[in-house]
Amino acid sequence: MLLLAVITTKFAEAQSFGNQAITYEELYDDPYAINKLFLHLQPLYADVFATNVNAGFGIGANYYLKDKADFQANFRQAYTRSFDLARDAAIKNQVIMNTPNNFTYFELGGTYHIKDEESDTETKLILYSRKYAKGNRWASHVPEHTVVPSKVRKIIGARAGGFAFDTSIDLKRITADQQVSLVDESGDPFPVQSYYYTNEIVTGGYIGGSMSWIKNMAIKPDKGYGVLVDDFIFTSFLDILIAPSIKLDTVQYRDPNLNNTIRKFAADVVDTKVWGFRLGMEGKYNRELGWAYGAEVGARPGIKGRGFYAMLKISVPVFSTSMNHSREAFGK
């Protein structure tokens, strides 16, 4: 009975505390007053690519040009051969002279703001009270929230840019799937039946559209709670990828049966696909020090039938600045 009374009392206290009306002071609410430059350190990305599954690190950057446009750049590279599956297999089963390349990816692009406007909305904020840290464990396990009026900035954009990536590929499996064979300059087939690999270099561009939502607001409740902030920047996008340049390195084989003569086998018998698509999203915070994430799914240009990919990247930390270092000066 005593235990039941204690639980009932604590529950009543939590309910009473949660039902209290909240008054607050608005500190700021301006989705246009965001930082201009964001620099990302990406300790982790994972790329489930039908051509080559890989994981690694990267760097990225975003720059916002007022309400006119924004620009982004990204570079990614596999950690080591153990996280670059096609390259690792190529080294373990190397029977040719080609050097397997590490997976690398580079992208540079921009978004023109076709429509960039502010509108009224509501923001849901999670409440945290100092009382939660004073043994009120019941309340701490039932997060409360409040909804306050705020502004949101919505951007409809037109995207364009370029990309390039370099990767090792399992040429033996690809030629078997496509039912083609490598032949040398004399028309003789490749003499080795074990696995052999080469490198693929793809260069192209993209064009698409995006939708962004930006909030940049903070309130200070009169008592009981800390400062509540919502400064999230979220972007979703859809792009068409076009790669006019898809290069497969010629396979070079030193044939021991022909006095170690170097024989060359062109890989142009492999079918490629010059276009693809992707659907993605990115999120970050308008803070001097924060974190961000991004995800994409789609099909990359390159080897026909091996373009599907799903990629996730995490940025920690993300540094940002308003790039406003001027100060007012007054004469005495």
PLM regions with names:
Residues 21-23, 163-294, 299-303, 316:
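Outer-membrane beta-barrel transmembrane domain signature
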